[in-house]
Design a protein with these regions (language model features):
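Single conserved hydrophobic/aromatic residue that forms the stacking wall/gate
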Residues: 362-374
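A "functional boundary" signal
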Residues: 4-9, 15-323
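Alpha-helical transmembrane signal-anchor helices
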Residues: 319-361, 365
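Alpha-helical transmembrane segments and their juxtamembrane interfaces
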Residues: 12-13, 372
Length: 374
């Protein structure tokens, strides 16, 4: 009975979310097409914010202010340009040393570990995190600390070669996931995402979708929060075997990613694979091309590697389709040319026939005139 109620609640919440968006999946895909064409607009807005922060950093009169602005610049560059985000994490570390503030040093070290983890430097990231004394960490940094360990071990598990290593990395991921749940407030986005992730790991997909949708319906969510929520919802649907649900929420996640002008993302790449499987080669090519361009600009080497494994297949299909269309166009032009020739020949013969008829009528008229004279 409890399971039936849970499924019913999930369906109701799913309906509410669909109503909130009020768009079909096809409409969302068309929206993505438009955003990709005009994505420079969103990038320009982000660049303007970065320029303003850099100006404030130059005008700062104390190391405390400089540290704060470097932190905000790190946040802006996070998932936008990893090399630049690492530079500002290093600047934070320098300022923290100068101010002799241990919590600032730990925060800067975790910033650097985050960038290392995102670029696939897992060993270096763990070594850096291992230098942090957990006992001296202030309460406000515990969530970030556990989040980094959970994320890095999760990625290591995803890319592990042997089953033994994969099992061990996922065991560590589970431990840090539980630690995160203990330090995050139960009404926070972080808690909901981690709890939903735990439900998904334990095959409780409907429960995960229910809590994610419930949080998604809260007002005033920023694009980044929407992107994370809808991506996790799509994962729930994927594991349920619901491709349409997966596609719909991947589209919502991709829209939020593109609007927030991030360059390091997953949703659009996965959406490209889905639409490719459905035979929409042009759209798949455009989505994957956009993902590759953004990953390259961001210096997101791991994402670039993931895309490069799929791109040749879709690119080949796209080129074959383009070649086939060119051949069809050539055949059409040849057919049109032949038809034009036949038409000209037909017009010529009709014209000659009409002249013959005219001469015949003229001859007949002359004969009739002669008869009247006789």
């Amino acid at each position: 009975m409890k399971k039936v109620i849970l499924i019913f609640v999930t369906i109701v919440l799913s309906g509410l979310l669909y109503a909130k968006e009020n768009k079909s999946t096809d409409a969302l895909l068309r929206e993505i097409d438009g955003i990709i064409k005009n994505r420079q607009t969103y990038g320009a807005e982000k660049e303007a914010r970065i320029a303003d922060l850099k100006k404030l950093l130059l005008e700062a009169t104390s190391d405390e202010q400089r540290y704060s602005f470097c932190g905000r610049l790190f946040d802006e560059y996070r998932a936008y340009n990893l090399d630049s985000s690492f530079v500002y994490a290093q600047r934070k570390e320098e300022l923290a040393h100068r101010m002799d503030k241990l919590d600032y040093l730990d925060d800067a070290a975790m910033n650097m570990a985050e960038v290392m983890g995102t670029t696939g430097m897992y060993k270096e990231a763990l070594e850096l995190l291992g230098q942090i004394d957990k006992k001296t960490l202030p309460d406000y940094l515990y969530g970030y600390y556990y989040h980094l360990y959970r994320t890095i071990y999760g990625l290591m598990g995803d890319y592990a070669v042997t089953e033994k290593a994969k099992k061990e990395y996922y065991r560590m991921t589970d431990l840090y996931r539980d630690s995160l749940l203990q330090v995050n407030a139960s009404d926070s986005l972080g808690y909901v995402l981690v709890m939903a992730d735990k439900c998904i790991v334990h095959a409780q997909y409907d429960e995960a979708i229910r809590m994610l949708m419930e949080y998604y319906n809260k007002p005033s969510l920023d694009d980044h929060s929407k992107a994370m929520l809808t991506y996790t919802i799509s994962e729930g649907y994927r594991l349920k075997g619901d491709k349409q649900g997966q596609k719909h929420y991947l589209a919502l996640s991709a829209i939020a990613d593109l609007k927030s002008a991030v360059k390091e993302y997953v949703s659009l790449r996965k959406l490209a694979s889905l639409v490719y499987d459905e035979g929409d080669i042009d759209r798949a090519y455009n989505y994957l091309k956009c993902s590759l361009e953004d990953a390259t600009l961001c210096n997101a080497r791991l994402r670039t590697l993931e895309i490069s494994q799929v791109f040749p297949i879709i690119d080949q299909a796209y080129q074959l389709k383009a070649k086939r269309q060119q051949q069809e166009m050539k055949v059409s032009l040849i057919c049109i040319s032949l038809l034009s020739v036949f038409l000209l020949v037909a017009i010529f013969f009709v014209y000659k026939q009409m002249k013959k008829v005219a001469r015949s009528e003229e001859h007949t008229s002359e004969l009739q005139s002669l008869r009247h004279l006789v």
